[in-house]
């Protein structure tokens, strides 16, 4: 959510930020509504003050035996007019809030400009993309040959974009999730959480999924939304809270199922596990001091990178351009892992600094030490990592010519010492 005062103070700057996002200017329309609303507020307040003053005068006249009929007529007229002014104030306020709620976060100054993913900028690479003396297979071909990945059975149960993992492959996915959680909690200091998988409208609004992206979510018949990421419940834990400055940063992590309708993904990644309606992910969330959120963003991204380094998986880090960032982000790093079966890098983590954008929607604040007032916190979120896509990366990078899969050393303690699957 955007600060109306900052739009009043710098409308050109606001429109410039929207232009970088590929959007039309909106400041003038917002400020016109704001002017009309403030006029309605002033009119209502003036009528209210006059009514109160006249009522006192009426009381005094009645006590003294004077004629209060003219004042009584005036008060009656004010009472008739006041509801319309109050209603106009509320209606204009709601219209402003609706517009502000639909506008994405403005990009940070160091985010590269561009309309789409072709304008993202590579920052660094780690590791050498794996090559084989044989033709590398996609993960779905590997899983099918092992008889441990069943898309047909999942389709019979649930339709497209689901999978049933079996035996040691199911165990490997569980091991990956546990390995990630242990790394993020024990070594990186995140507090493990086990949040609800369903949230109310207010939580989905707070992190920016609503009102614009409801079609990307699954909704229950009770009105709850299935979480698309643990970012939603974890971040909203601080909604309507005033935190102590000493408590910052708050770092939380959770391994949860995630649910996405993939409404805009028709025809994309229809084979395999790359794009599923249901998947597991370890999410990292930080609630940070505004002055420290930039450094926290770099730290969070490194925490995600460490997972891939421990697993020996080559990857690259890119900074998303203005046209490819998510709705709530002011700056985003994507981590893309090398998949030999596809001969390309694919996204496995997205780490975003949302500034105070989500905090304003959630009313999440902190009280600076020694000050009476409060400030909005900054919120950050990142995958640490997507478990299913990490499973894909392990399968493709550790495949062997005989169709088996070598278990990375870092995962063997979670697999009972197992070294090879198949």
UniProtKB/Swiss-Prot annotation:
The keyword Nucleotide-binding applies. Keywords: Aminoacyl-tRNA synthetase, ATP-binding, Cytoplasm, Ligase, Nucleotide-binding, Protein biosynthesis. GO terms for cellular component: cytoplasm. One of its GO terms (biological process) is seryl-tRNA aminoacylation. It is found in: Cytoplasm. Its main location: cytoplasm. L-serine binds at residues 229-231, 283, 383. This is Serine--tRNA ligase. It comes from Paramagnetospirillum magneticum (strain ATCC 700264 / AMB-1).
């Amino acid at each position: 959510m955007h600060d109306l005062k900052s739009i009043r103070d710098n409308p050109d700057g606001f429109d410039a930020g929207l232009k970088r996002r590929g959007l039309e200017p909106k400041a003038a329309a917002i400020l016109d509504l704001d002017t009309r609303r403030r006029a309605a507020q002033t009119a209502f307040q003036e009528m209210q003050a006059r009514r109160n003053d006249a009522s006192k005068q009426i009381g005094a006249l009645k006590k003294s035996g004077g004629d209060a009929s003219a004042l009584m007529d005036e008060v009656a007229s004010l009472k008739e007019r006041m509801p319309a002014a109050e209603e106009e104030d509320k209606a204009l306020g709601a219209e402003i809030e609706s517009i502000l709620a639909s506008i994405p976060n403005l990009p940070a100054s160091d985010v590269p400009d561009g309309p789409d993913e072709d304008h993202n900028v590579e920052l660094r690479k780690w590791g050498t993309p794996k090559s084989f003396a044989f033709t590398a297979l996609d993960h779905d071909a590997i899983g099918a040959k092992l008889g441990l990945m069943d898309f047909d059975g999942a389709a019979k149960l649930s339709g497209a974009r689901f999978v049933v993992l079996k035996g040691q492959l199911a165990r490997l996915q569980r091991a990956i999730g546990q390995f990630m959680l242990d790394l993020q909690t024990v070594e990186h200091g995140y507090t493990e959480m086990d949040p609800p998988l369903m949230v109310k409208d207010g939580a989905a609004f707070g992190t920016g999924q609503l009102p614009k992206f409801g079609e990307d979510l699954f909704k229950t018949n009770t009105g709850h939304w299935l979480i698309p990421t643990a970012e939603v419940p974890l971040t909203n834990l601080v909604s309507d809270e005033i935190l102590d400055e000493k408590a910052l940063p708050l770092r939380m992590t959770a391994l949860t199922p995630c649910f996405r309708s993939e409404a805009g993904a028709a025809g994309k990644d229809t084979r395999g596990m790359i794009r599923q309606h249901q998947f597991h992910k370890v999410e990292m969330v930080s609630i940070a001091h505004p002055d420290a959120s930039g450094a926290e963003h770099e730290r969070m991204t490194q925490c995600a990178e460490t997972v891939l380094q421990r697993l020996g998986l080559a990857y690259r880090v890119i900074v998303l351009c203005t046209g490819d960032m998510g709705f709530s982000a002011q700056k985003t790093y994507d981590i893309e892992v090398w998949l030999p079966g596809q001969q390309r890098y694919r996204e496995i983590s997205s780490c975003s600094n949302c500034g105070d954008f989500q905090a304003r929607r959630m009313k999440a604040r902190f009280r600076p030490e020694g000050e009476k007032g409060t400030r909005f916190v900054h919120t950050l979120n990142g995958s640490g990592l997507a478990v299913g896509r990490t499973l894909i990366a392990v399968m493709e990078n550790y495949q062997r010519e005989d169709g088996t899969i070598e278990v990375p050393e870092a995962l063997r303690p979670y697999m009972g010492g197992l070294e090879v699957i198949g």
